């Protein structure tokens, strides 16, 4: 999947993958990670997600990485946050006192940026990749996370032939097969969310499950 695909999605505001509210699984399960308030939390492919505001409200230092510049700028403007912009290597660094977003390719993000991270949150990153690229992303995420880091992974699963992503379908079997080498995995929840997603109903997708996993980097 080329970067131009995502840039065009944001330019055309075809961002059905963006949630207007804080993810319910984040609200329900984040406290189970038992993190101190000043924890550094990494959010890959963060977009302009309101979930980052929730994490900041818990006292965390949020470190996000997002390919699209428009998404990053919208996050700060939509939430009326004054930020400072600098250049860090190949990435543009937008930051407030508590939130740092690195705009650029996650595959070239320096590991020094996440070396003090002890937690992570992936709601829209794993499901953003087609299956042909997903395992490569999963390995990159693991390489950016120090051993012992804990995180919340949220996925969607549905019959992939019924709808072209993103978001793409990620099954529990895929999670186990491709993440278990690098993470300890605990299933927290799985529920049918089809009724809450009109886009999937309109496309006659027969079922849609959202799942939450607790991951710990080995």
From Swiss-Prot:
Its EC number is 2.1.1.67. Keywords: Cytoplasm, Methyltransferase, S-adenosyl-L-methionine, Transferase. GO terms for biological process: methylation; response to metal ion. The keyword S-adenosyl-L-methionine applies. GO terms for molecular function: thiopurine S-methyltransferase activity. The keyword Transferase applies. It is found in: Cytoplasm. S-adenosyl-L-methionine binds at residues 10, 45, 66, 123. PROSITE patterns: SAM_MT_TPMT. InterPro entries: SAM-dependent_MTases_sf, Thiopur_S-MeTfrase_Se/Te_detox, Thiopurine_S-MeTrfase, TPMT. Pfam families: TPMT. One of its GO terms (cellular component) is cytoplasm. It catalyses: S-adenosyl-L-methionine + a thiopurine = S-adenosyl-L-homocysteine + a thiopurine S-methylether. Belongs to the class I-like SAM-binding methyltransferase superfamily. TPMT family. NCBIfam families: PRK13255.1, TMPT_Se_Te. This is Thiopurine S-methyltransferase. It comes from Shewanella baltica (strain OS185). The gene is tpm.
């Amino acid at each position: 999947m080329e970067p131009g695909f995502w840039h065009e999605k944001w330019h055309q505001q075809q961002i059905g993958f963006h949630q207007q509210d804080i993810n319910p699984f984040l609200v329900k399960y984040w406290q189970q990670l038992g993190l101190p308030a000043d924890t550094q939390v990494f959010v890959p492919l963060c977009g302009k997600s309101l979930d980052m505001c929730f994490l900041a409200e818990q006292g965390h230092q949020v470190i996000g990485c997002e390919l699209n510049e428009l998404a990053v700028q919208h996050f700060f403007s939509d939430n009326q946050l004054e930020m400072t912009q600098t250049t860090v290597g190949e990435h543009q660094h937008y930051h407030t006192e508590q939130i740092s977003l690195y705009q650029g390719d996650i595959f070239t993000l320096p590991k020094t940026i996440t070396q003090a991270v002890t937690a992570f949150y992936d709601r829209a990153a794993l499901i953003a990749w087609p299956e042909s690229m997903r395992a490569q992303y999963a390995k990159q995420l693991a390489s950016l996370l120090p051993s012992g880091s804990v995180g919340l992974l949220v996925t969607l699963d549905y019959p992939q032939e019924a709808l072209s992503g993103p978001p793409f379908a990620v099954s529990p079997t895929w999670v186990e097969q491709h993440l278990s080498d690098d993470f300890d995995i605990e299933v927290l929840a799985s529920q049918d969310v089809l009724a809450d997603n009109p886009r999937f109903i309109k496309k006659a997708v027969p079922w849609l499950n959202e799942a939450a996993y607790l991951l710990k980097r080995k």
